[in-house]
Design a protein with these regions (language model features):
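Hydrophobic alpha-helical segments
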Residues: 121, 180-183, 187-191, 213, ...
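Charge-patterned, long linear interaction tracts outside catalytic cores
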Residues: 199-222
Length: 222
């Protein structure tokens, strides 16, 4: 599982300034006074997804054209204007499912929706993801579904936890997701999107995904 940048030839969708978000009251630092009751912290987007249906998860994902930033394979930050495609690829190189979001959506927000979509189509034993998906919520939800999560640990200023030898060997197959993204861009038109709007861009990319699936199945049969 991985995401790839999709550059678009359209303007960034402006946010509605009419929506005024009320300021959150800040709690005073330190222990609360006796009798004071502090409100419970709001759940994170990932925690909120636990109690949602697949349709609710997908509805909350931003699908408008936006600006995105990520690190490339060399460790340098790159920025682009457009979208982000999140394909879920099997170990044989065939995409099981895909979700298109705005470029500003973090990869981890799409992990649980992809897990549920792919579970309806294939029986998987493992789910392999890079450090962008490192989250206790994602790990627990995958384990509840009866699969093994192999997610590269993000130390976040702590000690990095390495894979066990057998897990590291299995994790090597995640490179198939990167090859799938590269083939979509180099061979099946994902690098040259001429249409505008989420629906048309998704249609353009899905035609490439269908062609990639057919080509990959042919390679597996030969």
């Amino acid at each position: 599982r991985d995401s790839t940048a999709i550059e678009a030839r359209e303007s960034i969708t402006p946010k509605d300034k009419a929506k005024v978000v009320p300021a959150k009251g800040k709690n005073k630092p330190g222990r609360p006074k006796k009798g004071d009751v502090r409100p419970a912290p709001e759940p994170s987007p990932l925690e909120r997804q636990r109690g949602q249906t697949l349709e609710q998860m997908l509805f909350e994902l931003d699908t408008a054209c936006a600006t995105g930033t990520k690190k490339n394979a060399q460790g340098y930050k790159i920025s682009w204007k457009g979208y982000k495609l999140h394909p879920d690829t099997a170990c044989c190189g065939v995409p099981n499912s895909a979700v298109l979001t705005g470029a500003n959506v973090h990869d981890s927000r799409v992990a649980l929706p992809l897990t549920r979509i792919s579970a309806q189509r294939v029986d998987a034993c493992y789910e392999l993801m890079d450090a962008a998906y490192c989250s206790t919520v994602i790990r627990e939800e995958i384990e509840v579904a009866g699969r093994v999560p192999l997610i590269d640990h993000n130390p976040r200023k702590g000690d990095k936890r390495e894979f066990a030898p057998h897990e590291a060997q299995r994790y090597k197959t995640r490179s198939g997701a990167e090859r799938c993204n590269a083939r979509l861009k180099d061979e099946f038109g994902a690098r040259h999107v001429q249409v505008r709007g989420h629906a048309k861009v998704m249609c353009h990319l899905m035609l490439g995904v269908v062609a990639l699936c057919a080509d990959q199945f042919t390679r597996l049969l030969v």
